[in-house]
Each structure stands twice: as structure tokens, then as C-alpha cells.
């Protein structure tokens, strides 16, 4: 799915800038927990007559096991392939017919779905998200072709990209015990062996209201939207709490190296270091340092290596 790097970078810069109103944003967010465990976050913003609906599930590649890696990302694709009441691609068509835009992404820690549309069409997105939280169709004739789409995505983005392949190996070398070592898109051999039943079991395990967060921001009345969320999601039963990832990565005791041999015009070298938590006091400092050192042609490393030492 399309990347949200620009939006993410904007959020990071906002959080890292002294004197910003990040704290006031937190004070303005309304937090609610429905009876079925669904967490709801609401932020009114009346600058424009639009709204964004996000549904986050606390499941990513870290929840997978060796032999079935890639399930989180495959399931992300299947969420757009119909429910018991909607046909394949009807979700996307409905959002676009209402003047909106939608997408999704999978990470190691979470899978998120979002739609941006006019605020007076907000209820459309809420109903669609509630439907696919509980009624995903999982038709075999949709699963098999979509799995092939994911495999082709892996070929294009990783297998055929030397730099991407190197970073995949770096991740595998950095983690020896924790499932963070899996690539989010999964290992190709695992993808070849995944079945519809694997994905269905994974969906039933993790796509539960008690394992999800609904986030709405934009031009709306929070009290009214909360009522709509209760109407759409409140009756979805919570089946059970999914298992917790308990793996702990042991301390690294020495340098680790990995080498990837691929046809390429130029050699590529990457160095990775263990860093403190991103939400800790040093997280923003490291983000800014990385930008100063290596972000773009004006960065210090680029000027030094390309212009001064060429």
C-alpha cells in the first residue's frame, strides 16, 4: 500500500520542535473504551470540512512465527477483498464514490487502515470498518490470487532491489531471538506455503475489538461520532485476548556482519546501531542527527563523500 512517510515525518518534526503544542494535542484527544474492549481516540479539528478514520490492530510481523511469516501483510491485502455483505473491492469503490481516499499499511508492531473523506460522510467509513472487522469473506478465489500479488510485491521491492535485500539481512542479523527479525512482507518460502485457513485463523485471533483502536480526527462533533462508533462497533463480540509476544532479545556481545552479493552498478555499505527507544528523551535527538548527517544532498555526509572527497 502507499507510503505515509511524508505525514509521518511531519509528525516527527512537530514532536521534536521546542515550543510546539504537542502536549495540548494530547489534552484535546478524547479517549474512550467500549464494553467490548475497543479503544476510541477522538480529536476535533475544524480547520477544514474533512475527517480521517483510522483503525489500528495490535498485530504485525512480530506476532508471526517462523514458517508463517508475512501473514499480517497478507491479511492487510485480504481486508480489501470483500466481506459477507460486500463484494471484492467494494470497500474501496464505496469510499471513492463518497469522494474519499483510503489505504493501509503493515509494520512489525501494527496493521492500520485509514480513510480520508468529507466529514459529512464519516459514518460511511465507520460502517465499512466495522463490517470488515467481523465479516471478512476469505473466499478461496480471492485469497490465492492475492497471495500471488504479495509474492510479486516481494520480488519487486526486495528480491530485485539489492539495497532492500541488504537491509532485510541486516534486520535478520540484528535480532537473533525476537520476531523483529522477520521481514514484514514475509520470507518467500513461507508465502508459498500459506493457506486460506492460516490467514482465517490469524484474522480470528487478532482482528478483535479488544485488540483494536479506532482513531477519528477532523471536523465533527465528538459526542455524536462516539455514538456512531458505539452503534457500528459496540455489538461486535470480543472473542479472546490474543497471545502476547514474550520474546526478549539478548544483549549483543560483538560486531555482526552480513554480506549480500547481487548485480549492482555500485557497491553499497550500511551500518546499523542499537538505539534507545524512539519515545525516549533521545529519540528526537537521533532523528534530527540522522537528518543533518544523511538526509538529502545538503547533508554533511553527502557533501563530504560526493563533493569534498570525490
Where on the chain are the PLM-derived regions?
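Short, low-order "capping/linker" segments at domain edges
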Residues: 253-261
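Bacterial Sec-dependent signal peptides at the C-terminal "C-region" and cleavage site
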Residues: 15-26
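Charge-rich, well-structured scaffold segments of protease-associated domains
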Residues: 28, 33-38, 90-241, 259, ...
Amino acid at each position: 500500500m502507499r507510503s505515509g512517510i511524508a505525514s509521518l515525518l511531519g509528525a516527527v518534526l512537530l514532536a521534536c520542535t521546542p515550543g510546539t503544542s504537542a502536549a495540548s494535542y494530547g489534552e484535546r484527544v478524547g479517549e474512550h473504551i467500549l464494553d467490548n474492549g475497543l479503544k476510541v481516540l477522538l480529536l476535533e479539528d475544524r480547520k477544514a470540512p474533512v475527517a480521517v478514520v483510522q483503525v489500528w490492530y495490535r498485530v504485525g510481523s512480530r506476532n508471526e512465527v517462523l514458517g508463517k511469516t508475512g501473514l499480517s501483510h497478507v491479511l492487510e491485502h485480504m481486508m480489501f477483498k470483500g466481506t459477507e455483505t460486500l463484494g471484492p473491492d467494494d470497500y474501496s469503490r464505496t469510499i471513492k464514490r463518497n469522494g474519499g481516499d483510503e489505504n493501509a499499511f503493515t509494520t512489525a508492531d501494527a496493521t492500520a487502515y485509514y480513510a480520508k473523506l468529507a466529514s459529512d460522510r464519516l459514518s460511511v467509513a465507520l460502517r465499512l470498518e466495522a463490517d470488515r472487522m467481523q465479516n471478512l469473506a476469505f473466499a478461496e478465489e480471492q485469497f490465492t490470487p492475492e497471495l500471488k500479488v504479495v509474492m510479486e510485491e516481494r520480488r519487486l521491492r526486495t528480491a530485485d532491489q539489492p539495497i532492500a535485500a541488504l537491509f532485510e539481512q541486516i534486520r535478520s542479523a540484528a535480532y537473533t531471538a525476537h520476531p523483529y527479525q522477520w521481514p514484514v512482507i514475509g520470507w518467500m518460502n513461507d508465502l508459498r506455503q500459506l493457506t486460506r485457513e492460516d490467514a482465517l485463523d490469524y484474522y480470528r485471533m487478532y482482528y478483535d475489538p479488544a485488540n483494536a483502536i479506532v482513531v477519528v480526527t477532523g471536523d465533527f462533533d465528538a459526542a455524536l461520532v462516539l455514538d456512531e462508533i458505539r452503534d457500528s462497533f459496540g455489538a461486535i463480540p470480543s472473542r479472546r485476548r490474543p497471545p502476547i509476544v514474550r520474546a526478549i532479545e539478548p544483549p549483543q556481545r560483538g560486531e555482526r556482519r552480513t554480506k549480500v552479493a547481487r548485480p549492482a552498478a555500485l557497491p553499497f555499505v550500511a551500518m546499523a546501531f542499537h538505539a534507545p527507544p524512539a519515545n525516549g528523551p533521545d529519540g528526537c535527538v537521533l532523528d534530527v542527527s540522522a537528518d543533518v548527517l544523511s538526509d538529502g544532498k545538503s547533508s554533511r555526509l553527502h557533501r563530504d563523500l560526493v563533493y569534498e572527497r570525490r
